[in-house]
Amino acid sequence: MDNAVDRHVFYISDGTAITAEVLGHAVMSQFPVTISSITLPFVENESRARAVKDQIDAIYHQTGVRPLVFYSIVLPEIRAIILESEGFCQDIVQALVAPLQQEMKLDPTPIAHRTHGLNPNNLNKYDARIAAIDYTLAHDDGISLRNLDQAQVILLGVSRCGKTPTSLYLAMQFGIRAANYPFIADDMDNLVLPASLKPLQHKLFGLTIDPERLAAIREERRENSRYASLRQCRMEVAEVEALYRKNQIPWINSTNYSVEEIATKILDIMGLSRRMY
């Protein structure tokens, strides 16, 4: 077995496999192991299921260690094939459904693709999410200041502090219309809140970042430039943080947080509703 990998982990589904991945990752994060992840969506027929079984078995015979298999599969005949494999198989949905079935005295009615598929009941939500993504792309990095009043949140910050990925995550994951506005080097001589943003102060949220981390990120983009110098980064961060304090704009330091964590903190602090898709 590869010394760099402790366990091989499969995430298998007859749908997108997003549920299997999310729950499986949450479980595996509890263990101090290095994993090699394999995600296999749309395992919807017996021939594909047998190919997946063969893949699991091949890794077992190669390594001598049972692969871990997190699966979410509706059709019993497909499940049965996966369960014949040499993997340690866990039905991540059924583990929760069974006790709920007992508590609610209701039988589940599993349908493939129900969680992340399109159906007449969720088309409006899907359209709203696409509209949020379109809006966010059109208002990235201060490209357009039109219709800013339609934003649910407007992220502020220096270049490369995480505004764009956070905005896109908010739009794609939660259907939030997120604009973002950059403060650039030329702004620093007299940094003030732009007039176009003042009426929308209740929608503003600031991001900052440790200067050392900012310099490292910028160095990858523009090596040996003034833009990436630690001195420049320290000055910009100090100026922007002073602006946040002066205007009472809520803000967080993004240095040690993932995009998911940053987005969740913004939703919580700004009181924005989470939408599930």
UniProtKB/Swiss-Prot annotation:
One Gene Ontology MF term: ATP binding
Pfam families named in the record: Kinase-PPPase
Reactions the enzyme catalyzes: [pyruvate, water dikinase] + ADP = [pyruvate, water dikinase]-phosphate + AMP + H(+); [pyruvate, water dikinase]-phosphate + phosphate + H(+) = [pyruvate, water dikinase] + diphosphate
Superkingdom, taxonomy of origin: Bacteria
Top-tier EC class: transferase
EC number of the protein: 2.7.11.33, 2.7.4.28
Ion transport listed as a keyword: no
Keyword terms of this UniProt record: Kinase, Nucleotide-binding, Serine/threonine-protein kinase, Transferase
Residue numbers binding ADP: G157, V158, S159, R160, C161, G162, K163, T164
Xref: HAMAP family: PSRP
Family: Belongs to the pyruvate, phosphate/water dikinase regulatory protein family. PSRP subfamily.
Annotated function: Bifunctional serine/threonine kinase and phosphorylase involved in the regulation of the phosphoenolpyruvate synthase (PEPS) by catalyzing its phosphorylation/dephosphorylation.
Listed name of the protein: Phosphoenolpyruvate synthase regulatory protein
Source organism per UniProt: Escherichia coli O17:K52:H18 (strain UMN026 / ExPEC)
Lineage: Bacteria, Pseudomonadati, Pseudomonadota, Gammaproteobacteria, Enterobacterales
Underlying gene: ppsR
